[in-house]
A protein has these predicted regions:
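Conserved catalytic core of nucleotide polymerization and phosphodiester-bond processing enzymes
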Residues: 1-432
Length: 432
């Protein structure tokens, strides 16, 4: 069967089906196979299937060659899992449990049948905090580009670990001054699990308040799931508040360009609000994005249902108004979402030109059959580079805003750095 897809107002793509699709939770994805199969004829064809399995298990911070070797080294575990998953539960240790179990069945099929085995399993390559990849590319930020794998390296860069290390150094400085919470934080440990979600929300107008909440949740999760001793007692709020300040500073040091892009998009949004116009822009795929944010007024309806008096309330949209607050909070994440949607569109078009017809797509995770993954990997890089070399998206945003609002006082975009986007074409771990 085929999935029916729809586009939202930013041109992001979503399957209409909500129960089982390439964009649902782990268990739903685990049920999906491509109708068409492709033969795995040699080790090169099998590489991406091996990489995909390592990624699903959680062994995704090492080089590709180490991930491939991991799959071959675990042949015994995989065979036992595929033959008797109810009794041999090694697979339950995987990060994405159900998809990994499905992968074990596929790898077992390859081991059993050998070269020529027809694979139907979607294999995925994920972006490195994809929103930050776009933000770094927009301003040609070398520091952010290195942290998000826009620049080639022997192993994948991990921005969450980078921010965790910066945070740890700041906390160590406080601990040396006798700061009690800092000392407890160092004893507990500051790693990527603490900083991952705060970093992930940055491209989407995440706040320091949200950062504190995510840090508290991460600490509580480590205590509960890993059985770590809790040195903080009932004081997680103040611990989260303390760490949030340092995590926020670490983020700003790592991806300063991201802040400048988001702040600039918000500035452009204020000019739309001043002109009482809905904010809009045109993406590199020529898709017109319009933010339909208007003010609302609460209305109360009094009616009778089955002899009982019932009050119903609803929000009535007020015509010829714009919601200044929603423009401010929504403009930056919507802008970035529209750009990752454009990159996905351009990638799929290139794949179709290359006669590839099977896709398993999320906005920051592109998938197809293992033998075709090298082709898709090259095409998605070409699409990304082409998009940002041919389109100055901030200048386009500004010029379109002046055209719509008639306001020539909109400031020019911030200056760019020296990142060479051609480096993306050589970066193995841009999508990995």
């Amino acid at each position: 069967f085929y999935f029916v897809w729809q586009l939202d107002f930013r041109s992001r793509k979503y399957p209409v089906e909500s129960f089982m699709s390439p964009q649902v939770a782990d268990w739903g994805k685990a049920l999906l196979l491509f109708n068409n199969g492709f033969p795995i004829n040699d080790y090169e064809d099998a590489d991406w299937l091996a990489i995909h399995g390592a990624n699903l298990f959680g062994n995704d911070k090492v080089s590709f060659s180490e991930r491939v070797q991991w799959a071959w080294d675990n042949e015994d575990n995989i065979v036992k899992t595929a033959e008797n998953p109810l009794d041999y539960t090694w697979w339950t240790e995987a990060d994405k449990t159900w998809q990994f179990l499905g992968w074990c069945f596929e790898w077992y099929g390859l081991l059993r049948e050998g070269w020529g085995y027809y694979t139907h399993l979607p294999c995925a390559a994920d972006g490195s905090c994809n929103g930050l990849q776009h933000l770094s590319a927009i301003l040609r930020d070398e520091v952010g580009g290195k942290a998000t794998n826009l620049i080639a390296g022997d192993k994948p860069s991990d921005i969450y670990t980078d921010v965790a290390e910066k945070t740890k150094r700041l906390v160590e400085a406080d601990a040396e001054q006798g700061h009690e919470i800092a000392r407890k934080c160092l004893t507990f440990g500051i790693d990527r699990s603490i900083t991952k979600r705060p970093v992930m929300i940055v491209p989407y107008s995440g706040t320091q308040h949200a950062c504190r909440e995510y840090i508290q949740e991460a600490i509580a999760d480590k205590i509960e799931k890993k059985g770590l001793e809790n040195p903080f007692g009932d004081d997680l709020f103040n611990v989260g508040l303390y760490l949030a300040g340092h995590v926020w500073q670490g983020i700003n040091e790592t991806i300063s360009s991201a802040r400048r892009v988001m702040d600039y998009v918000k500035v452009v949004g204020t000019h739309y609000a001043d002109a009482v116009k809905h904010m809009e822009w045109v993406t590199p795929t020529n898709f017109l994005v319009v933010q339909p944010y208007v003010n609302t007024k609460k209305r109360l309806i009094k009616t009778h249902v089955d002899g009982n008096l019932v009050y119903l309330s609803y929000q009535q949209e007020l015509p010829d108004t714009v919601n200044r607050s929603r423009i401010s909070t929504g403009s930056s994440p919507n802008f970035i979402h529209s750009l990752d949607a454009a990159a996905l569109t351009m990638t799929v078009n290139r794949c179709l030109d290359a006669k590839m017809m099977d896709f398993s797509m999320v906005h920051d995770s592109y998938g197809t059959h293992s033998p075709n993954m090298p082709i898709m990997s090259q095409l998605l890089r070409e699409a990304f580079v082409d998009m940002y070399e041919k389109h100055d998206v901030l200048q386009d945003l500004r010029d379109h805003a002046e055209k719509v609002t008639g306001d020539s006082s909109i400031p020019q975009p911030p200056a760019k750095g020296n990142l060479d986007l051609q480096e993306v074409l050589k970066s193995e771990y841009f999508f990995a």
